[in-house]
Amino acid sequence: MDSQGRKVVVCDNGTGFVKCGYAGSNFPEHIFPALVGRPVIRSTAKVGNIEIKDLMVGDEASELRSMLEVNYPMENGIVRNWDDMKHLWDYTFGPEKLNIDTRDCKILLTEPPMNPTKNREKIVEVMFETYQFSGVYVAIQAVLTLYAQGLLTGVVVDSGDGVTHICPVYEGFSLPHLTRRLDIAGRDITRYLIKLLLLRGYAFNHSADFETVRMIKEKLCYVGYNIEQEQKLALETTVLVESYTLPDGRVIKVGGERFEAPEALFQPHLINVEGVGVAELLFNTIQAADIDTRPEFYKHIVLSGGSTMYPGLPSRLERELKQLYLERVLKGDVEKLSKFKIRIEDPPRRKHMVFLGGAVLADIMKDKDNFWMTRQEYQEKGTRVLEKLGVTVR
């Protein structure tokens, strides 16, 4: 709470999950799927102890997704369906989750780098007009990740459910001209894993079994350090084979798919996406920075988001960066490679890193009036109030 007794709420709206809670906390109070569903046919009023309503949101929508037409209001980190987004916020602030009187609260929201200005304006408008928050702040996700890690300068590799961003931050300011995005993230890896399992002969339904396959992915997938070696192991031995029990009791065996699915992050062509993979994109981003800042960036690469949780990802990233640096900068001179310092930070709680950074920032700033956009300022200026964030509003 701030000095006037107002609650300070932190809400990290991801493409796949909403993480929300309060300033100063170490963990989100609630984490739930960013999902809105409507029943396909009204056959029963209840399933188990869940009542079927015309509109289902979050956890309940996820549990009954096979009976619903489901919709994610956000795509690749950007709001595409504002009506459904409001349903999601109603659920977040309402009795099911935070249960707050929004008029007596301040809120810190997060946004992806390179977010269109229109998107940000609309979010602020909804927060003040629909929910009447007393103060609003919108922070860039990559900057919050670095705050959570106690850094002001570094490169954030943030890979969530809907989008992967590589975002250099210098002295607490994100550098939009150097920010790169890759439209491959958790959801695409899950889809690819479904495809690989179908090829193996297991029958999966893309929407109904999506959650099940996501859980298989989280439990069994990893990033291969040396892909040729992994493929050899998968072909010639059974060391990679793991059994997984599905919710209906069937047992499936998963082998090479364990590393083949996340490989799409490094080789986008596997899922028909053009462009370079995450390692080369990271290398290109740092090399495009000012020559004086490059060493700092190489030493402070911070992983963030659920899709960076694969075992083996940090070491593979480091291996590829060194290889690219050797080939393209040192022109193959191995002697000089020892001077090349690289450090990849993979904090254990990186899944909720953005929320943690937001909770730290909101707590430090809770009583600083010049930090928050206030309802009164919004009434006077409209969306021009965003100038307070240091964001130019066209």
UniProtKB/Swiss-Prot annotation:
InterPro entries: Actin, Actin/actin-like_CS, ATPase_NBD. Component of the Arp2/3 complex composed of actr2/arp2, actr3/arp3, arpc1b, arpc2, arpc3, arpc4 and arpc5. It comes from Xenopus tropicalis (Western clawed frog). ATP-binding component of the Arp2/3 complex, a multiprotein complex that mediates actin polymerization upon stimulation by nucleation-promoting factor (NPF). The Arp2/3 complex mediates the formation of branched actin networks in the cytoplasm, providing the force for cell motility. Seems to contact the pointed end of the daughter actin filament. In addition to its role in the cytoplasmic cytoskeleton, the Arp2/3 complex also promotes actin polymerization in the nucleus, thereby regulating gene transcription and repair of damaged DNA. Keywords: Actin-binding, ATP-binding, Cell projection, Cytoplasm, Cytoskeleton, Nucleotide-binding, Nucleus. GO terms for biological process: Arp2/3 complex-mediated actin nucleation; positive regulation of double-strand break repair via homologous recombination; positive regulation of transcription by RNA polymerase II. ATP binds at residues 160-162, 214-218, 305-310. The keyword Electron transport does not apply. The gene is actr2. One of its GO terms (cellular component) is Arp2/3 protein complex. GO terms for molecular function: actin binding; ATP binding. This is Actin-related protein 2. Belongs to the actin family. ARP2 subfamily. It is found in: Cytoplasm, Cytoskeleton; Cell projection; Nucleus.
